[in-house]
């Protein structure tokens, strides 16, 4: 027992469980919904194997059941299974709806992160372009040799220097200081990098504000990312 290798991460624990209970867990592809109370079954069957502790098993289960492929498998008509793959009852509507919302929120977070990364890339590219387009220092022209003239020449009027175009005024936004003052249906904006996306308030929760973007996607946003 002392010579058993130790599993250091939740992913390694999941891989071990998929090998130990292939009819219940899977390392890839769509996952099957697990029996309610399966944690206690795991403790009784594998605690001590591979030096596994209850904390490691609990963390691995949490990671497994919050993964996209597991949430995809929680759908109407699906059946829960125990460690040996035996059916343990059909999923109820409440659990299916909860999984759908979790998956939707996870996708929204990924999309918001990608939008923020794209905004930063565009900002960096624009800054690099401005440096390349900066005008080089003009050389002063050499004065032309004077010619002897019998009549005085009238000096040409110098053209006024062209005014540099004004930089576009950056749109100003007011931060949302108190989310409890927000109302359902109120319009505001969600900050993503230097951009602000139009959104509508759907719900005010303890974790933040659920909003809907113009694209139809809904997500929960913290107060510091909301502006008017």
Swiss-Prot record:
Record's keyword terms, sorted: Chaperone, Cytoplasm, RNA-binding
Compartment(s): Cytoplasm
SMART domains reported for this sequence: ProQ (SM00945)
One Pfam family per UniProt: ProQ
GO molecular function, one term: RNA strand annealing activity
Region Disordered, residue ranges: 105-178
Gene Ontology cellular component list: cytosol
One GO biological process term: post-transcriptional regulation of gene expression
Primary location: cytoplasm
Composition-biased stretches (Basic and acidic residues): 117-136, 146-173
Record-linked InterPro entries: ProQ (IPR023529), ProQ/FinO (IPR016103), ProQ/FinO_sf (IPR036442), ProQ_C (IPR035236)
HAMAP family on file: ProQ
Family, as annotated: Belongs to the ProQ family.
NCBIfam families for the chain: PRK04950.1
Function per UniProt: RNA chaperone with significant RNA binding, RNA strand exchange and RNA duplexing activities. May regulate ProP activity through an RNA-based, post-transcriptional mechanism.
Protein's name in the database: RNA chaperone ProQ
Organism, scientific name: Citrobacter koseri (strain ATCC BAA-895 / CDC 4225-83 / SGSC4696)
